[in-house]
Amino acid sequence: MASSYAHAMERQALLPARLDGPAGLDNLQAKKNFSVSHLLDLEEAGDMVAAQGDEGGGEPGRSLLESPGLTSGSDTPQQDNDQLNSEEKKKRKQRRNRTTFNSSQLQALERVFERTHYPDAFVREDLARRVNLTEARVQVWFQNRRAKFRRNERAMLASKNASLLKSYSGDVTAVEQPIVPRPAPRPTDYLSWGTASPYSAMATYSTTCTNASPAQGMNMANSIANLRLKAKEYSLQRNQVPTVN
């Protein structure tokens, strides 16, 4: 105990001597300066971190929601719908914006359309300056005018084809009327002959020719009657000629 107490007293006696010396003061001041500057640096860094924590970490997740790139799921469909509605409104406004042409403008446009249906850019620009319109309006007018011209041409061709078909069908029905032939009269002498006559085959053939004209039927009947008369005369002459033994 006595030795330890004596050692402590010696250290206390030596401490003032170290502090009073110039080297000891310089070392202590250097340590003090270094530690203060280091603490200031740490305090400044800590203040910056604390400020960032107060700004960003006060409400967790708020910065993510408030960032422009990230939005909540409930807001996204509503924004898309608003954007679509605005685009539809713009389209409707563009469609409703139509140009009304006066009589002088229409006359000038029609006069150029009679010359050419497809004017080039130089012609359109010159015409637009003359009628006090934009080149885009003139181009749209020519597009609509060409479409109207094509519709009128198709309507005219359809009406012409319908009239031609109607006239052709009338001519065909007038030509293709059926003609009913008259039945040929039967001769009276044909009924007087029997079936055993040698010319009965010719008589049966005459009955099949019912579709012939009346004049042809009469000529055929006369020729058959003449043949029958000749046959009778021949048979009578044969019976009268005596036979030679």
From Swiss-Prot:
Pfam families: Homeodomain (PF00046), OAR (PF03826). GO terms for molecular function: DNA-binding transcription activator activity, RNA polymerase II-specific; DNA-binding transcription factor activity, RNA polymerase II-specific; DNA-binding transcription repressor activity, RNA polymerase II-specific; HMG box domain binding; RNA polymerase II cis-regulatory region sequence-specific DNA binding; RNA polymerase II general transcription initiation factor activity; RNA polymerase II-specific DNA-binding transcription factor binding. A motif (OAR) lies at residues 222-235. Signal peptide: none annotated. Its main location: nucleus. InterPro entries: HD, Homeobox_CS, Homeodomain-like_sf, OAR_dom, PRRX1/2. Expressed predominantly in the mesodermal cells of the limb bud, visceral arches and craniofacial process, and at lower levels, in cranial mesenchyme, upper and lower eyelids, somites and cartilage of vertebra. Also found in the heart, especially the developing semilunar and atrioventricular valves and in the brain, in a distinct region of the ventral part of the hypothalamus as well as in a broader region of the telencephalon. GO terms for cellular component: cytosol; nucleoplasm; nucleus. Residues 69-84 have a biased composition (Polar residues). Residues 94-153 bind DNA. Residues 50-103 are annotated as: Disordered. It is found in: Nucleus. Keywords: Developmental protein, DNA-binding, Homeobox, Nucleus. GO terms for biological process: artery morphogenesis; cartilage development; embryonic cranial skeleton morphogenesis; embryonic limb morphogenesis; inner ear morphogenesis; mesenchymal cell proliferation; middle ear morphogenesis; neuron fate determination. Gene3D superfamilies: Homeodomain-like. Belongs to the paired homeobox family. May participate in maintenance of mesenchymal cell lineages derived from both mesoderm and the neural crest and in patterning of the limbs and the face. Interacts with MAF and MAFB. This is Paired mesoderm homeobox protein 1. It comes from Gallus gallus. The gene is PRRX1.
